[in-house]
């Protein structure tokens, strides 16, 4: 009985290598999509660090990067209520990165900042970083951060939103209502 001998031509071998490379690239993208951490939106509450939810605090403590909103004063000083809340929670300062929002009626400048933040967050997430984006009050209630949240959802990027205490609820409690 004669044995069958299979010979591959160099062209077929090269085509097979190219197919394998394409497959591995595709598989890597699937793994990144399904194995990466969701981008988390954490609500910081009305300003008192003690009023953050336990779930929000846990997300902040686990984060590799926390994107925090700030503004620049007329004197050039960086201002951030969100950063003061985070500082009060004793979160490591090295994980906090600021995104500076211009105080202007022209919202197109703000959208550009959010578009840049979107790209940075995606890049960090693709490097297997746990990404958190914070907002004062509740990130899902009357928050401009909703713009970037919607952009992630439209592009099928996995996101989580951690609820917080809105200022009007805290004010009602303070007033005894």
Residue ranges and their predicted role:
Residues 9, 19-20:
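Serine residues within intrinsically disordered or low-complexity segments
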Residues 11, 28-29, 34:
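Low-complexity, intrinsically disordered or signal/transmembrane-proximal segments
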Residues 146, 165-166:
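Alpha-helix N-cap/helix-start capping motif
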């Amino acid at each position: 009985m004669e044995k069958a001998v299979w010979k591959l031509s160099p062209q077929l071998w090269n085509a097979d290598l190219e197919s394998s490379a394409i497959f591995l690239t595709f598989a890597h993208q699937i793994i990144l999509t399904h194995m990466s951490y969701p981008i988390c939106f954490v609500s910081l509450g009305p300003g008192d660090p003690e009023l953050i939810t336990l779930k929000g605090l846990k997300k902040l403590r686990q984060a590799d990067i926390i994107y925090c909103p700030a503004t620049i004063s007329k004197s050039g000083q960086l201002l951030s209520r969100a950063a003061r809340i985070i500082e009060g929670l004793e979160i490591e300062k090295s994980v906090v990165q600021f995104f500076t929002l211009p105080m202007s009626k022209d919202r197109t400048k703000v959208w550009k900042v959010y578009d840049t933040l979107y790209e940075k967050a995606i890049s960090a997430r693709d490097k297997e970083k746990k990404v958190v984006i914070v907002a004062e009050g509740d990130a899902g209630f009357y928050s401009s951060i909703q713009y970037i949240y919607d952009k992630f959802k439209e592009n099928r990027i996995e996101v989580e939103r951690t609820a917080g205490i809105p200022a009007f609820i805290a004010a009602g409690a303070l007033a005894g209502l």
